[in-house]
């Protein structure tokens, strides 16, 4: 039986469309590539540098002042460098040989427990359900940490940045929203289980909302 290499982003395709997920892993048929905006990647880089400067000073950044006295920034720089890497990240392999890895943005530490912190850049203020789109990703990160022997809290944080205004000197100001969400390890386990089951079965039906499958069906007439 073939084994597979998963990541939170590749597993998100399972929810979007089981057929596209099956084709991607079993037939190496991928969605057409599109231009990826560079701004989120640039923001991610400068935010990590910003947080690392605060970590070296042993202080929390202004965006996390509401957590003062409760947590500190994870300060194992070498380990954090590995866990942030898209080529390494936090890894785990199941007994069948299926491999999953994920690259985190940052970690907070509360006593002996870790708390995953992820940065998100948006163009607009949050909606009521914005954080729900990232629950699977955060559950998988926590699952991986626990599989590697680290205790994590039963919650995680998303730190959202969205543009607010441009000052007279040209500096762009961002508002921030810190959102605390509950961790569900069982959800991560179920995602992995379903992923393997789908890939080991026949090609599934496409999602009704999948624009790629709709496009293909129209091409085929």
What function would you assign to each model-found segment?
Residues 32-34, 124-127:
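Short small-residue beta-strand/loop micro-motif enriched in glycine and branched aliphatics
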Residues 1-109, 113:
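Metal-dependent nuclease catalytic cores that hydrolyze phosphodiester bonds in DNA/RNA
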């Amino acid at each position: 039986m073939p084994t597979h290499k998963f990541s939170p982003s590749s597993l998100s395709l399972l929810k979007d469309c089981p057929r596209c997920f099956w084709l991607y892993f079993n037939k190496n048929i991928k969605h057409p590539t599109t231009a990826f905006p560079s701004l989120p990647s640039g923001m991610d880089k400068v935010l990590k540098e910003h947080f690392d400067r605060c970590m070296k000073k042993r202080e929390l950044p202004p965006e996390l002042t509401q957590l003062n006295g409760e947590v500190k920034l994870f300060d194992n720089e070498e380990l954090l460098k590995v866990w942030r890497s898209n080529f390494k990240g936090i890894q785990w392999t199941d007994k069948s040989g299926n491999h999953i890895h994920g690259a985190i943005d940052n970690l907070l530490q509360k006593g002996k427990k870790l708390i995953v912190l992820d940065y998100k850049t948006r163009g607009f203020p949050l909606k009521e359900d914005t954080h729900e789109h990232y629950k699977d990703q955060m559950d998988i990160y926590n699952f991986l940490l626990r599989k590697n022997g680290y205790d994590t809290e039963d919650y995680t944080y998303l730190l959202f940045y969205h543009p607010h205004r441009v000052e007279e000197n040209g500096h762009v100001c961002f508002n921030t929203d810190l959102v605390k969400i509950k961790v569900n390890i069982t959800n991560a386990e179920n995602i992995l289980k379903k992923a393997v089951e789908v890939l080991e079965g026949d090609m599934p039906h496409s999602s009704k909302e999948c624009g790629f499958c709709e496009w293909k069906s129209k091409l085929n007439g």
